[in-house]
Amino acid sequence: MGQIVTFFQEVPHVIEEVMNIVLIALSVLAVLKGLYNFATCGLVGLVTFLLLCGRSCTTSLYKGVYELQTLELNMETLNMTMPLSCTKNNSHHYIMVGNETGLELTLTNTSIINHKFCNLSDAHKKNLYDHALMSIISTFHLSIPNFNQYEAMSCDFNGGKISVQYNLSHSYAGDAANHCGTVANGVLQTFMRMAWGGSYIALDSGRGNWDCIMTSYQYLIIQNTTWEDHCQFSRPSPIGYLGLLSQRTRDIYISRRLLGTFTWTLSDSEGKDTPGGYCLTRWMLIEAELKCFGNTAVAKCNEKHDEEFCDMLRLFDFNKQAIQRLKAEAQMSIQLINKAVNALINDQLIMKNHLRDIMGIPYCNYSKYWYLNHTTTGRTSLPKCWLVSNGSYLNETHFSDDIEQQADNMITEMLQKEYMERQGKTPLGLVDLFVFSTSFYLISIFLHLVKIPTHRHIVGKSCPKPHRLNHMGICSCGLYKQPGVPVKWKR
């Protein structure tokens, strides 16, 4: 009986010792968390900046850990399943089908057909032409808005050679004065969309209106030709033809829901149709080896359809699977892409970039892309299009704000993922309750609320990072070289 009484007398002491151990452990955690808050509140960053200001001018890293990288897509690999367009000079443009044949679209002042008719039915009965090439011409012709002057088109199929001629001149002075609403303007509009993505096309737009295209040439001639080294002004791209095709399909089925048309999901490296990582082989890239993008980036392509890079991934994926199943038969491949185009690309994106090109606004040519790579984890962002203006790619400084925003988005995604993982593993309620009760932690929280500044900004301009400005507003690298400009501290 005495032993039982002694045991119960010792219980409070045991509980007290346990509580002491718990309090010591929580105090250590509170001190460690307070030290962490001191390290991240900006004080260390401020001291580091004061020591390094005006010296470090690294341009390859953003937010300290994200490196800007680029890739260029080689769209010549798509030639077996979809027509590619490119340009040789101001007047000669080409459509590539397969490895040997194609179409030449020429702006000229010399007529090659004297008559004013086009006997398509007779040519079809005699099987005079290549049906793969003719389907491309049909897509072009059916895309011309309000084509109601059949004498403006002539064609000839002698010996299997395709020759189609559009008259761009005006028979009446009234038509010349009202060029914007004529068939000639419609032909030029469609031509610029077929040979899309080139401010190098010599068309004089003298009215300042994007839908009014004028030229000094009198004829547009389309002929079949052998495929040689024609692409001297631009690389081959399927976007022009696919843009025409999807726009014509949208005009026919105007009531379709946009999101309902996107049904193609990217397969993984094993060909499975589940969202996952996706790798671009060296055959798909220009002057680059294998590049892979993880689940996080590629899953966005399967969820959303508002990025040009996602459209190109779908085209490459479609091309790979179509070649395996169709054995690269040209006519069958073109028929398939005609039916599948609305499941692969966002025609609104193509139209938007085409209009931006005509209006002189930087646009996407679907060839070059930039993305951020985490130098430690290797995690990448979803590549975004590197915009083109006046025939050349923009300088990196023109979209530095977009790069900073992309880095912020990646940091936010990483923190959200880490938070969810931590919440699923560690019960933080008791620890946080005690931590918030310590004065050391309250001081660290106060420093966070104060928001100690860490670097200087030029008044009225964006963040200069990764450049470091001194009190005169200059950086020793030479980019910011005007001394005496007003600066202010920012966190």
UniProtKB/Swiss-Prot annotation:
GO BP: any one term: fusion of virus membrane with host endosome membrane
Topological domain ranges for the Cytoplasmic compartment: 34-58, 454-491
Positions of Zn(2+) 2 binding: H455, H457, C463
A Pfam match: Arena_glycoprot
Positions marked as site (Cleavage): T58, T59, L259, G260
A single Gene Ontology CC term: virion membrane
Residue positions binding Zn(2+) 1: C57, H467, C475, C477
GO molecular function annotations of the record: metal ion binding
Transmembrane intervals: 18-33, 433-453
Keywords (A to Z) from UniProt: Disulfide bond, Fusion of virus membrane with host endosomal membrane, Fusion of virus membrane with host membrane, Glycoprotein, Host cell membrane, Host endoplasmic reticulum, Host Golgi apparatus, Host membrane, Host-virus interaction, Lipoprotein, Membrane, Metal-binding, Myristate, Transmembrane, Transmembrane helix, Viral attachment to host cell, Viral envelope protein, Viral penetration into host cytoplasm, Virion, Virus endocytosis by host, Virus entry into host cell, Zinc
Entry-listed glycosylation sites: N79, N89, N99, N109, N119, N167, N224, N365, N373, N390, N395
Swiss-Prot/TrEMBL site (Important for GP-C-mediated membrane fusion) positions: K33
Disulfide bonds: C86-C231, C118-C155, C180-C212, C279-C292, C301-C310, C364-C385
Domain of life: Viruses
Effect of S56A: Complete loss of SSP cleavage
Listed InterPro entries: Arena_glycoprot (IPR001535), Arena_glycoprot_zinc-bd (IPR043015)
Lipid-conjugated positions (N-myristoyl glycine): G2
Extracellular side stretches: 2-17, 59-432
Stated family: Belongs to the arenaviridae GPC protein family.
HAMAP family: ARENA_GPC (MF_04084)
Protein name, UniProt field: Pre-glycoprotein polyprotein GP complex
Species this protein is from: Lassa virus (strain Mouse/Sierra Leone/Josiah/1976)
Phylogenetic classification of the source organism: Viruses, Riboviria, Orthornavirae, Negarnaviricota, Polyploviricotina
